[in-house]
Amino acid sequence: MKKILIDSGPLIALFDRSDKYHQASTEFIKKNRSELITTLASVTEVLHLLDFNRNAQVDFLSWVDAGAVTVETITTDDFQSIRELIVKYSDLPMDFADACLVFLGEKMNISKVATIDRDFDVYKLKGKRSFTTYVK
């Protein structure tokens, strides 16, 4: 099965009906046939930004627990590479969650990302390959 990275933005929008990207995120999820891949950093970001609605947080966790998205492990062994990405893109700046996704893209050879973050138009994978972005 093909894989696609998913950033926190579409996940937040999916569980927040008032978000301006809710409809686009919902349509993406309905049409998507690829395995969704994210990181614990993105999951944490989603839960933090959904903190205004406990039910949305619980629904999101249930959705993840049901296997709707695969949460890949980032270990301290990966921190050097992640730190290098944060330094490389310090002018944006790149946050830890985005750096983890770019790192996973490189590690797992995934160049597709569901995001509303325009920074993914700037981020490059090894070999200067661009990400193909969805949702935004």
Task: Report residues per predicted region.
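Metal-dependent nucleic-acid phosphoesterase active-site entry motif
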Residues: M1-D19
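Short, flexible helix/strand-to-coil boundary loops that buttress conserved ligand/catalytic motifs
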Residues: F15, D117, K124-G127
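A secondary-structure boundary/capping signal
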Residues: D7-S8, T39, I116
